[in-house]
Amino acid sequence: FGWYEKKIQDIDAWVEGLEEKYPYEKLMLSDYGADANIYHQTEYLGQSLNWTKPYYPETFQTKTHEYQWSVIARHPYIIASYLWNMFDFATPMADRGGIPGRNMKGLMTFDRKTRKDSYFWYKANWSKEPVLHLTQRRNVDREKQETSVTVYSNIGMPKVFLNGRELQGVRKGYTDVHYVFDHVTLGDGKNRLKAVVSRDGKEYTDEIEWNYSGEKNRGTEAYENKNEHFGL
């Protein structure tokens, strides 16, 4: 949903429809997800993306997994689900998304070196290890002066500081580890974000840096294809 057809949020009505039509059955979701090229970043996201185009922003993958996992988690009717995929992998006949021969639906890049935001989404939701993660660390060149800040934390509500000033108005997102600060105004130039959680006498922190230099909408024209090893 949101990738090959329909919209991200349509998974909810689809599951509820199956529950109503087949109440004595159970559902196993064989795969779900979206591609993410970590070199493609934007704040302008809709509820669907044309997978035949060369533009696969990481932020769209993040949005897909945030919402669709939350739907899966609150529907016990779905007894099993399989996210697609752990790692980007070779698809030699493909030529889309900015890297020929690559399926980029992984939570990590093909070389296993970069963990996408969606990786930390699942780690925060599933793992007992402490997770504190500010999203969009690769979306450095910001398009909007007024934006939102998202944090994944399975160790409690985070405090977030922008250039040393604490942000107010945090709200819960789709699950208990999902925290969002809306209507955050960036300053011109560098903007340093720091998330902090204190738990059991230990302080956890995460920091990223964004840059704002005026309103823009990069779109697909800002990116070129990258030739990388197929892995075959």
Please report, for each region that a protein language model flagged, where it lies by residue:
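Surface beta-strand/loop "capping" patches
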Residues: 123-155, 221-232
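Substrate-binding/catalytic cleft of secreted carbohydrate-active enzymes
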Residues: 1-125, 129-143, 164, 174, ...
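Surface-exposed, short loops/turns at beta-strand junctions within beta-sandwich domains
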Residues: 183-190
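Beta-strand signatures of extracellular beta-sandwich domains
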Residues: 157-161
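Edge beta-strands of extracellular beta-sandwich domains
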Residues: 201-214
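Short hydrophobic alpha-helix segments
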Residues: 170-171, 207
